Amino acid sequence: MEELPATAVGLKVNDGIVLASERRLSYGGYVLSKQAKKVYKINKFLMAGAGIYGDLQTLTRIMNVEIKYYEVSTGKPISVHAAAKLLSVILYQYKVMPFISEILFGGVDEKGPQLYVLDPIGSLIEDNYAAVGSGARIAIGVLESEYDPNMSLDVATQLITKAIKASIERDITSGDGIDLAIIDKKGNYENKFIPY
């Protein structure tokens, strides 16, 4: 499969989870937007991705509705793994006409921080860190060289920012700033924008 334009990176540490993406939206060598948010908060979870922007937005809307439906139907919150599995099933249902996107999905529940990587047909892989999109090869090298599950969320945020900046320097479809989303082990959410 051709590499999907954009770069998104996720990192799980003992204190929480961080997802980040750059903001450039490009197609066929053209920059369509410099303000495209590709990191989403869905209920108490985070999702980031690379690929067709409209597909990412559609998946975000579907997941918002499905998670709310699950919680209203069962009367209890959905776990991170169950929500990731739900996303996997949704992607698989569209395997004939797939959503053209690679996705990072994560959150924190009673089992601690969790990070999952999904491809366009719903393959679900749990990992400590991951990068997707056209800048993934560059970003993953930065993560591999410095990752430590015991690092603080502040250090994790610095590392993920360094990984995205490295991909922006080498990947023409990535750029125009960095969106970061953080959930700590207590479930507190924070988002940041870093101009670059």
UniProtKB/Swiss-Prot annotation:
It catalyses: Cleavage of peptide bonds with very broad specificity. GO terms for biological process: proteasome-mediated ubiquitin-dependent protein catabolic process. InterPro entries: Ntn_hydrolases_N, Pept_T1A_Psome_bsu_arc, Pept_T1A_subB, Proteasome_bsu_CS, Proteasome_sua/b, Proteasome_suB-type. It is found in: Cytoplasm. The keyword Cytoplasm applies. PANTHER family: ATP-DEPENDENT PROTEASE SUBUNIT HSLV, METALLOPROTEASE TLDD. This is Proteasome subunit beta 1. The lineage of its organism: Archaea, Thermoproteota, Thermoprotei, Sulfolobales, Sulfolobaceae.
